[in-house]
Curated annotation (Swiss-Prot):
The keyword Phosphoprotein does not apply. It comes from Cressa truxillensis. InterPro entries: AAA+_ATPase, ATP-synt_VA_C, ATP_synth_F1_bsu, ATPase_a/bsu_AS, ATPase_alpha/beta_chains, ATPase_F1/V1/A1_a/bsu_N, ATPase_F1/V1/A1_a/bsu_N_sf, ATPase_F1/V1/A1_a/bsu_nucl-bd. Signal peptide: none annotated. It catalyses: ATP + H2O + 4 H(+)(in) = ADP + phosphate + 5 H(+)(out). Keywords: ATP synthesis, ATP-binding, CF(1), Chloroplast, Hydrogen ion transport, Ion transport, Membrane, Nucleotide-binding, Plastid, Thylakoid, Translocase, Transport. GO terms for biological process: proton motive force-driven mitochondrial ATP synthesis. The gene is atpB. F-type ATPases have 2 components, CF(1) - the catalytic core - and CF(0) - the membrane proton channel. CF(1) has five subunits: alpha(3), beta(3), gamma(1), delta(1), epsilon(1). CF(0) has four main subunits: a(1), b(1), b'(1) and c(9-12). This is ATP synthase subunit beta, chloroplastic. CDD domains: ATP-synt_F1_beta_C, ATP-synt_F1_beta_N, F1-ATPase_beta_CD. The lineage of its organism: Eukaryota, Viridiplantae, Streptophyta, Embryophyta, Tracheophyta.
């Protein structure tokens, strides 16, 4: 049964304070705590370490194992510096609960739901436990529908499923952050939805950069924080493995409230899902479990499934999740990315080659995939257009070696025409972003799916063969490309 959000604060009641234990062993971020007989805490209960002379250390731990001899083993959510054997530990009687609702927008939280942005306490008494079961099958919305993003290359070639999971693959500096911010902006404007960003085990500098860029682009409104479109939850790579393992659940819990109670469409970003697995692996070793393949935890599939199954569409609203996936040593057979792939509905692959050409978003049109690109789901017209675009780009890719050695003149008339159209398509797949207006000076464009299909059909039909390829670069719909061509001629 799903546990509902509670309207109680995080204070420990006087009754619960009586359930005190003592630290008997500390190994890094793992604590063993002894409790009186018959007063053992439950698995996933939050424990709070009490300092000497009632000085609160504010180290929250989560019960992971019950060992026998009235001992439990718990994982700390923050540094264990300064802890000693014999210190008192309070069993709160509940699992970690975090603030939820509109008051979380525009704020930055840690794994415990505590604000870390120095903007004061969160203006809400509504909290929700981070451990919940996935929605029952009868609550799910099984209708397959496209989640329109307004980004041409995504909507045409690798469309997102409403309530689906998308893997975002790309190295450093190819535009992951800008793409994420544009999606946050577009869901707010086109769908009236909100976003939750979970920074799992990534660099603190990147989290800070993202926050600053969101403020610059208006995704976070400093003047009126309530008008912000995103809540941020961070558990960065300098934090203990317990925090990195649970921060994804904290972000998901906030997203679930917007879906189930506010009945909104929510975009949940997890950067990086590999770090979630990595943290689980560290915790598993510390808890003394036997490692599985490549040293990963034996519970890898279960942990991933528990998180991913909560990300879904219900009859109230949807959570569409975009997860950055780091592939260790580019080995796609590694258990961490391989387990992630089993849950994904679409993949968006960012290409360094396209970024080097200045084509943004640098989404690789041939490597990006989607299970939604089927005629029975997207319709014959969309499917045919997407397939013809891919065929044209694939043929251009095959001819590039010949062009590099012999030049364009050695190609047949038909191949020269294919190359010309492919270059127009490649440029038309770029588009100006709203969140990049600050840097580019070009106003952002949201292009509807019907407009996108019409534009590519016109290029493929040959009607625009006479226009220069520069006219298709960084424009919105096809009418802007023809207008730009007229300007270039004059």
């Amino acid at each position: 049964m799903r546990s509902n959000p509670t309207x109680s604060g995080s204070e420990v009641s006087a009754v619960e304070k009586k359930n005190l234990g003592r630290i008997v062993q500390i190994i890094g971020p793992v604590l063993d705590v002894a409790f009186p007989p018959g007063k053992m805490p439950y698995i996933y209960n939050a424990l709070v370490v009490q300092g000497r002379d009632n000085e609160q250390m504010n180290v929250t731990c989560e019960v992971q194992q019950i060992l026998g001899n009235n001992r439990v083993r718990a994982v700390a959510m923050s540094d264990t510096d300064g802890l000693m054997r014999g210190m008192e530990v309070i069993d709160t009687g509940v699992s970690i609960s975090v603030p939820v609702g509109g008051a979380t927008l525009g704020r930055i939280f840690n794994v415990l739901g505590e604000p870390v942005d120095k903007l004061g306490p969160v203006d809400t008494k509504t909290t929700s436990p981070i451990h919940r079961s996935a929605p029952a099958f009868i609550q799910l919305d099984t209708k397959l529908s496209i989640f329109e993003t307004g980004i041409k290359v995504v909507d045409l070639l690798a469309p997102y499923r409403r309530g689906g999971k998308i893997g975002l693959f790309g190295g450093a500096g190819v535009g992951k952050t800008v793409l994420i911010m544009e999606l946050i902006n577009n869901i707010a404007k086109a769908h009236g939805g909100v976003s939750v960003f979970g920074g799992v085990g990534e660099r603190t500098r990147e989290g800070n950069d993202l926050y600053m860029e969101m403020k610059e682009s208006g995704v976070i409104n400093e003047e009126n924080i309530a008008e912000s479109k995103v809540a941020l939850v961070y558990g960065q790579m300098n934090e203990p493995p317990g925090a990195r393992m649970r921060v994804g659940l904290t972000a998901l819990t906030m997203a679930e409230y917007f879906r189930d109670v506010n009945e909104q469409d929510v975009l949940l970003f997890i950067d990086n899902i590999f770090r979630f697995v990595q943290a689980g692996s560290e915790v598993s070793a510390l808890l003394g479990r036997m490692p599985s393949a490549v040293g990963y935890q034996p519970t890898l599939s279960t942990e991933m499934g528990t998180l991913q199954e909560r990300i879904t569409s219900t009859k109230e609203g949807s959570i569409t999740s975009i997860q950055a996936v780091y592939v260790p040593a580019d080995d796609l057979t590694d258990p961490a990315p391989a387990t992630t792939f089993a849950h994904l509905d679409a993949t968006t692959v960012l290409s360094r080659g396209l970024a080097a050409k200045g084509i943004y978003p640098a989404v690789d049109p041939l490597d990006s995939t989607s299970t939604m690109l089927q005629p029975r789901i997207v319709g014959e017209e969309h499917y045919e257009t997407a397939q013809r675009v891919k065929e044209t780009l694939q043929r251009y890719k095959e001819l590039q070696d010949i062009i590099a050695i012999l030049g364009l003149d050695e190609l047949s008339e038909e191949d020269r025409l294919t190359v010309a159209r492919a270059r127009k398509i490649e440029r038309f797949l770029s588009q100006p972003f709203f969140v990049a207006e600050v840097f580019t000076g070009s106003p952002g464009k949201y292009v509807g799916l019907a407009e996108t299909i019409r534009g590519f059909q016109l290029i493929l039909s040959g009607e625009l063969d006479g226009l220069p390829e520069q006219a298709f670069y960084l424009v919105g719909n096809i009418d802007e490309a023809t207008a730009k061509a007229m300007n270039l001629k004059t």
